[in-house]
From Swiss-Prot:
Entry keyword Cytoplasm: yes
Main location group: cytoplasm
GO cellular component: cytoplasm
Molecular function as annotated in GO: GTP binding; translation elongation factor activity
Top-level taxon of origin: Bacteria
Protein name according to UniProt: Elongation factor G
């Protein structure tokens, strides 16, 4: 359930990979 997570965190996770 990552709908409440902002896109900044998702982008950081994607760029963190």
């Amino acid at each position: 359930h990552y709908q409440e997570v902002p896109r900044q965190i998702q982008e950081k996770l994607i760029k963190g990979q």
